[in-house]
């Protein structure tokens, strides 16, 4: 019953995504499992530390590609693999981004396998999506299982939008910059997140 109730709430909220390959703009509701995946605080602290380290490494990698190119000169990665990539932008060679940060946000997908360890499945750095679903899913969980949030110290996620805004504002030298989100429009599969 609670699964059905949660799915009704999700439908009423318009939490949908476009189906890949659908030419008619077909959408379906965001898949939602009422059984929470519990991550212990000690595990999360280790994961968070690793994710921060990974972001530093990704930024150092990008900076090297657009500056010294040691990773290419030392043959760690073949040059043609980088230069032929859709994401490589030759005009960025020698560019120094604000605060020295190339990649400000990433959707890093994790999996937990049978040995209990977490592994990175992929780094979504070009156009990370999914956080709006996390925020809304948390609200659905609070409505569906209020007793869980009363009985346990569940870490909040609702501060993410303000943290993202502050991150984006920090890129400007203006005292009170305006931040906007550009979207391809309502037929984009992640439009729910853009809106």
Whereabouts are the PLM-identified features?
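Preference for protein termini
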Residues: 1-195
């Amino acid at each position: 019953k609670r699964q059905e109730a949660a799915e009704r709430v999700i439908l009423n909220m318009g939490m949908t995504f476009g189906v890949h390959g659908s030419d008619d703009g077909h959408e379906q509701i965001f898949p939602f499992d009422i059984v929470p995946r519990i991550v212990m605080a000690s595990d999360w602290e280790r994961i968070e530390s690793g994710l921060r380290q990974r972001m530093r490494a990704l930024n150092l990698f990008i900076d090297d590609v657009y500056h010294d190119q040691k990773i290419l000169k030392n043959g760690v990665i073949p040059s043609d693999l980088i230069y032929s990539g859709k994401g490589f932008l030759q005009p960025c060679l020698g560019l120094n981004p604000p605060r020295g940060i190339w990649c400000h946000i990433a959707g890093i997908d994790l999996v937990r396998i049978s040995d209990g360890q977490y592994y990175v499945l992929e780094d979504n750095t070009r156009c990370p999506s999914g956080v709006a679903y996390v925020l809304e899913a948390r609200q659905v969980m609070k409505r569906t299982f209020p007793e869980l949030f009363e009985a346990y110290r569940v870490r909040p996620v609702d501060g993410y939008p303000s943290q993202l805004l502050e991150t984006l504002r920090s890129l400007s030298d203006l005292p009170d910059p305006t931040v906007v989100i550009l979207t391809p429009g309502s037929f984009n599969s992640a439009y729910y997140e853009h809106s």
